A protein has these predicted regions:
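C-terminal catalytic/acceptor-binding lobe
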Residues: 141-211
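A short acidic (Asp/Glu
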Residues: 15-17, 57-60, 109-114, 153-154, ...
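Short, solvent-exposed loop/turn segments at secondary-structure junctions
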Residues: 12-13, 29, 52-54, 104-107, ...
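Short coil/turn segments at beta-strand junctions that form active-site/ligand-binding loops
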Residues: 2, 19, 43-45, 95, ...
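A structural signal for short, well-ordered beta-strand segments and their strand-loop junctions
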Residues: 46-50, 97-102, 162-166, 205-207
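Active-site-proximal specificity loops/subdomain of glycosyltransferases
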Residues: 7-49, 54-73
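Short, hydrophobic beta-strand segments that form beta-sheet elements in well-ordered domains
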Residues: 2-11, 99
Length: 211
């Protein structure tokens, strides 16, 4: 409990009477909410986690180690959490500003428990000390959605590498009711894609033949 802060809107305060909370204004959107989280956390190291995410650990056999569980993956244990935090700190100590996780439905890279410079979504660890050097240069509200793609590209194009856990992975159901789906539209998706393409034309392209 002491290590978890729920980021909630004012209209939700009554639902979290005994929790540590960071309260933001109602209906400000995911991009502005993320900006507030980053700037409030400052130079700490911290995890940002969507509220519908589950974490799993994959069987060590994927990485040429003896099996450490039944099946291909399982939910994290307390010992897994301790090991995961050690690995995240190791990556941050080695200048990886942000660390993410592989989506559980995608097979891992064999014999590679960590890979580098990919997309980071849904759950990630941030080194606030490194982020503090560029945080004021980033327009976190450039797009109202796809803000995670924008954040990834802002950091990568500035030369800040990331690390992505293969052995530890996340599960998330997409298009659940609530959240961004209360205001996301196809028109908004298209507008954000065009803005990202304009800002990062070398790395974000649009295939108009499929539209």
């Amino acid at each position: 409990k002491d290590k978890v802060i729920f980021v909630i809107q004012k209209q939700e305060e009554h639902l979290f009477p005994d929790k540590n909370t960071l309260v933001v204004e109602d209906n400000i959107g995911i991009a502005k909410t993320r900006e507030i989280i980053y700037k409030t956390a400052g130079k700490k190291r911290y995890l940002v986690v969507d509220d519908d995410v589950l974490l799993h650990r994959r069987n060590a056999t994927y990485f040429s180690e003896p099996s450490n569980m039944e099946g291909s993956k399982r939910k994290l244990t307390d010992n897994d959490w301790n090991e995961l935090l050690q690995r995240l700190n190791y990556q941050h100590d080695n200048n990886h500003i942000i660390c993410g996780f592989k989506f559980s439905a995608i097979l891992p890279r064999f014999n590679q428990p960590t890979f580098y410079n990919g997309g980071v979504f849904a759950i990630f660890s941030i080194d606030g000390e490194q982020l503090s050097k560029v945080i004021d240069e980033i327009d976190f509200n450039y797009v109202p959605i796809q803000e995670d793609v924008h954040f990834n590209l802002e950091l990568l194009t500035r030369g800040y590498p990331n690390a992505i856990m293969e052995e530890f992975c996340y599960h998330q159901k997409y298009n659940n009711d609530g959240g961004c789906n209360t205001f996301r539209t196809q028109q908004m998706e298209d507008m954000c894609a065009e803005k990202l393409n304009k800002k990062f034309p070398k790395y974000y392209t649009i295939d108009y033949s499929k539209t």
